[in-house]
Amino acid sequence: MLIRSLLIGDLDADSALWGRNLLKRHTWGQVDLPRLIEGGAALQMFTTVTKSPQGQNYARNAADAADNITLLALAQRWPAAAYDSLFARAMLQADRVLTAAAQSPQLTLIRSKTDLSSLLSQRADGHSIVGALLGTEGSHALDGELDNIDRLYAAGFRMMGLQHFFDNRLGGSLHGESQAGLTRF
């Protein structure tokens, strides 16, 4: 079967946002481990959604617009720190992925080239295993603190989007108000 010979990776899943068990099959939502394995996925980037401006669109979004994720955080009873800290939101979602990886030998966090090589070797030996990568949707997850890059890295993040739908301290988003490039931040 052709699909089993391909190296399939998906670079954007917001599944950790919703508080579902990533190890159990669901009939809704983006991904879960059983469906990833059935689809032959080798790599899944779990991107952390930390802010979604109300009225989000592809033309222009204000960074100071009311935030949809705050409402979700309240509804899901996230820890209080995640109500107003985008960094805390990223760490909460990362913890959900890390917890799932710790509970299943079929999901492994990719932090290094060695981890990736090990994953590929196991898959070549016929093991059903998926590599999990952590990333942010926008550098606003830094909460304006460059030291948070090191903290995200230590937690397992290996990708950080610069902007996502609105401007932040690092620069202007294609969908933001300033339409500017990178800042000195």
Which residues does each PLM region occupy?
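N-terminal hydrophobic targeting/anchoring segments and the immediately downstream early-domain regions
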Residues: 1-179
